[in-house]
């Protein structure tokens, strides 16, 4: 009796996962400024480059690291690694949604949208504004770039309007990857 034996390389060897982006903080960056952006996601170790769909934006990787999962949030939603990026937006850039792609050693991420500029002046959420007595004054119209620091955080804003004036308040958080 004879036996035939075939040896082959394991064709099912799993390739490393490419980078995946969960969110960028802040969700928006201002025209004509340099802003530090934290890109959170998975498999972001070893990343040395990000690309923008807009040539008026330059992106410089400052560091990559493990990311703590914020209290009460799920790592499957917010990621476990992060990239600190310096984003510089030229003054002549028009407000728009811009796609960022993470270029990693194991492939490229899917594009992630970040807001660039606004048709309204943008201000940052300033603490302490956690109650009506500490409400942060804002103008109308105004775009506010806010951050929820923990699961019980509330941000309160105060503004003046006429009796008959109607307001449209739009929150972009969820559609741009925020854990809010």
Predicted segments, located by residue:
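Extracellular recognition modules
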Residues: 99-103
